[in-house]
Amino acid sequence: MAKYHSSGKSSSMTAIAFLFILLITYTGTTDAQSGVCYGRLGNNLPTPQEVVALYNQANIRRMRIYGPSPEVLEALRGSNIELLLDIPNDNLRNLASSQDNANKWVQDNIKNYANNVRFRYVSVGNEVKPEHSFAQFLVPALENIQRAISNAGLGNQVKVSTAIDTGALAESFPPSKGSFKSDYRGAYLDGVIRFLVNNNAPLMVNVYSYFAYTANPKDISLDYALFRSPSVVVQDGSLGYRNLFDASVDAVYAALEKAGGGSLNIVVSESGWPSSGGTATSLDNARTYNTNLVRNVKQGTPKRPGAPLETYVFAMFDENQKQPEFEKFWGLFSPITKQPKYSINFN
């Protein structure tokens, strides 16, 4: 699932490197590097120091974490891993209420580590819904965090955004018809888009072909969801789609164009496939999806061909404290053995 960069030095192939050749070797432009989401809802996970070592050994150059953790941030010092750091939804009210609160958050969780931790993005909130009580605070929190980062002298290094999911779409088929739901736009999304355009920051989108497939298996084939279709499945004007992931991303691009955000880029902040516990879950399906995902995003989408799509694979480990059952099995690695669950070979 993760996107790994090859070192380009075959002579360094030690026993550890042989283990990780099972995982993705990726060479491409900087923006095409992919990361892995490091969720921590498990009681058997490796220590943060061990996790950072595993990222480095596997050549995973980008990480997403779902909230600031001093333990994790300390472990990242000097690692050269680029970080997507979330601000949890329950922090939005506090950060929107006061610039001082935002300044303190940035000082405590970014500035104090920025000399040797490579912060790439801050995601202010994750999958905020219009009905959430904190939705009204999202845009003010974005603005306050942006000012705090700029005041800390990090404005050229750290981009501020938020992550939505494809449930924000009113239409997604065909992709060119993509549009956002009016309640999302009214609650916060129009303000988010204006903010991102003004600050030249990407929109983050969690894209799960798994959920789209399991919600509608009559109309969506498993091959289309797993990037296995041998030919075009959806013809949308001059653009042909052979997989659901590209169609989903391009539907968001189309929706952005209709909402004044046509200049924005997308970062896929989560995507993956579970290996057990639910419909269409297996090691083979997880391996197939994630292998093909990493290959596919290097090339862009039909709407934006040749523009590599920065993507974060979900997730680094199986997390045994999540529910329902299938939510426990998205990991690339076993948390106990710290070994890959299946091979993904891009050589």
Curated annotation (Swiss-Prot):
PTM comment: The N-terminus is blocked.
Active-site annotation: E127, E270
Protein name in UniProt: Glucan endo-1,3-beta-glucosidase
Family: Belongs to the glycosyl hydrolase 17 family.
First-level EC class: hydrolase
Catalytic activity: Hydrolysis of (1->3)-beta-D-glucosidic linkages in (1->3)-beta-D-glucans
One Pfam family cited in the UniProt record for this chain: Glyco_hydro_17
PANTHER family reported in the protein's UniProt record: GLUCAN ENDO-1,3-BETA-GLUCOSIDASE BG1-RELATED-RELATED
Molecular-function GO terms, alphabetical: glucan endo-1,3-beta-D-glucosidase activity
GO biological process terms held by the UniProt record: carbohydrate metabolic process; defense response
Signal sequence segment: 1-32
SUPFAM superfamilies, A to Z: (Trans)glycosidases
Entry keyword Cell inner membrane: no
Taxonomy, superkingdom: Eukaryota
GO cellular component: vacuole
Lineage, opening ranks: Eukaryota, Viridiplantae, Streptophyta, Embryophyta, Tracheophyta
Biological role stated in the UniProt entry: Is thought to be an important plant defense-related product against fungal pathogens. Is capable of releasing soluble and highly active elicitor molecules from fungus cell walls.
Enzyme Commission code: 3.2.1.39
Induction: By ethylene.
Keywords from the UniProt entry: Glycosidase, Hydrolase, Plant defense, Signal, Vacuole
